[in-house]
Amino acid sequence: MAVDIEYSYSSMAPSLRRERFTFKISPKLNKPLRPCIQLGSKDEAGRMVAPTVQEKKVKKRVSFADNQGLALTMVKVFSEFDDPLDIPFNITELLDNIVSLTTAESESFVLDFPQPSADYLDFRNRLQTNHVCLENCVLKEKAIAGTVKVQNLAFEKVVKIRMTFDTWKSFTDFPCQYVKDTYAGSDRDTFSFDISLPEKIQSYERMEFAVCYECNGQSYWDSNKGKNYRITRAELRSTQGMTEPYNGPDFGISFDQFGSPRCSFGLFPEWPSYLGYEKLGPYY
């Protein structure tokens, strides 16, 4: 079939062949063909792109009228000599409580000596030497109370506390009361005292006391090794007596929490073991 078409085309006249097929040749275009993808305008494209530089916020400024040469609406002058501030009641009450608390602390008293019975060895030696020794002492709201140990030298005995509230310009003797001993047949007796403190005590005066034991026409004193037992204000408390190092013998042992015989032997050589504990009396 291809042969027939070629033959018919070649058998035509030259002029006929040129005129018949000339219209099939497409003319040359001066402009390129329009693409099928439509792009937006430059403005629309610019709006689609995120801005890279952030706009700076403008800071607000406040200016007063006098800076602009104008008159102020109202002028208020504050002075410390004006009327007192209107402080709320709860704040005023709080300030009063703080002041009263500070005053109470300045008027509170403390013991300016350690408890004598805290060091048992020293307490026992003082009792045997002086026949009397303060055992313990505590401060209550407006009173001082404690106990005294004395050797039972005779049946008739008197124990009293000699106390001063004005640095020994004057003093008062307060009798002690006998306390029945729990252990019968003990060679030591116990006395107690409870002394009320005065309402007003001058800050420059010292409160001191000593213990007196009268028996068989003789007097025995416990004056805390000549320093007396002092009661001072909390803010003036002397820590010298409370921080003195222990001057007793150094046994060179470490305490055993289970109470081994080596510990008891170091403290009390007369105790070879706990077998002799039953033969001992109370520590006082």
UniProtKB/Swiss-Prot annotation:
The modification Phosphoserine is found at residue 260. GO terms for cellular component: glycogen granule; protein phosphatase type 1 complex. Acts as a glycogen-targeting subunit for phosphatase PP1. Facilitates interaction of the PP1 with enzymes of the glycogen metabolism and regulates its activity. Suppresses the rate at which PP1 dephosphorylates (inactivates) glycogen phosphorylase and enhances the rate at which it activates glycogen synthase and therefore limits glycogen breakdown. Its activity is inhibited by PYGL, resulting in inhibition of the glycogen synthase and glycogen phosphorylase phosphatase activities of PP1. Dramatically increases basal and insulin-stimulated glycogen synthesis upon overexpression in hepatocytes. PROSITE patterns: CBM21 (PS51159). Keywords: Carbohydrate metabolism, Glycogen metabolism, Phosphoprotein. A motif (PP1-binding motif) lies at residues 61-64. InterPro entries: CBM21_dom, CBM21_dom_sf, Pase-1_reg-su_3B/C/D_met, PP1_3B, PP1_regulatory_subunit_3. Residues 124-232 form the CBM21 domain. GO terms for biological process: glycogen metabolic process; negative regulation of glycogen catabolic process; positive regulation of glycogen biosynthetic process; regulation of glycogen biosynthetic process; regulation of glycogen catabolic process. Signal peptide: none annotated. It holds the Pfam family CBM_21. Highly expressed in liver. Moderately expressed in kidney, heart, testis, spleen and lung. Weakly expressed in skeletal muscle (at protein level). Expressed predominantly in liver. Expressed moderately in heart. Expressed weakly in lung, kidney, spleen and skeletal muscle. The keyword Transmembrane helix does not apply. It comes from the Eukaryota. GO terms for molecular function: [phosphorylase] phosphatase activity; enzyme binding; glycogen binding; protein phosphatase 1 binding; protein phosphatase regulator activity. The PP1-binding domain is located between residues 59 and 94. The glycogen-binding domain is located between residues 94 and 257. The PYGL-binding site lies in the C-terminal 16 amino acids. The keyword Phosphoprotein applies. The gene is Ppp1r3b. This is Protein phosphatase 1 regulatory subunit 3B. It comes from Rattus norvegicus. Interacts with glycogen, PPP1CC catalytic subunit of PP1 and PYGL. Associates with glycogen particles. Forms complexes with debranching enzyme, glycogen phosphorylase, glycogen synthase and phosphorylase kinase which is necessary for its regulation of PP1 activity. CDD domains: PBD_PPP1R3B.
